[in-house]
A protein has these predicted regions:
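Short glycine/proline-centered loop/turn elements that form peptide/ligand docking sites
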Residues: 34, 38, 60-64, 80-87
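Active-site acidic-Proline motif in GNAT/NAT acetyltransferases
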Residues: 25-27, 31, 59-60
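Conserved catalytic-core motifs of GNAT/GCN5-like acyltransferases
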Residues: 54-57, 69, 74-90
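Acetyl-CoA-dependent GNAT
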Residues: 1-27, 38-40, 44, 100-103
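Conserved GNAT acetyl-CoA-binding A-motif
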Residues: 45-56
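Terminal substrate-recognition subdomain of acyl/acetyltransferases
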Residues: 87-103
């Protein structure tokens, strides 16, 4: 009903992970599954020594932005005109968010 994908950085940024995807099936929306998955991901990352989690979200996705902010993610920058959606004329801004985990 859902999955998440995390990529851990290497070298001097080995304390950082990028949360690339967190997705739930349409029928699971509103069930709390995404919240449980996010908490599971953050707990596992913290237990493995990760101290910083990064993610990006489309600027026109207020539901996802609010979701990430509820977990304490902070807006750290905007990548303007980051990409173009298929079949659309305009470009999409990508918002960069970060979260520092407890040591």
């Amino acid at each position: 009903q859902g999955f998440y994908k995390v990529q851990r950085h290497l070298g001097r940024a080995a304390h950082v992970a990028y949360l690339g995807t967190l997705a739930v099936a349409p029928q699971a929306k509103g069930s709390g599954l995404a919240r449980r998955m996010m908490q599971d991901a953050l707990d596992r990352l913290a237990a493995s020594g990760i101290r910083r989690v990064e993610l990006s979200v489309e600027a026109d996705n207020p539901r996802a932005i609010a979701f990430y902010q509820r977990f304490g993610f902070v807006h750290e920058g905007t990548q303007r005109a980051a990409y173009k959606r298929a079949g659309e004329d305009g470009y999409v801004d990508e918002l960069m968010y970060g979260l520092l985990l407890e040591a």
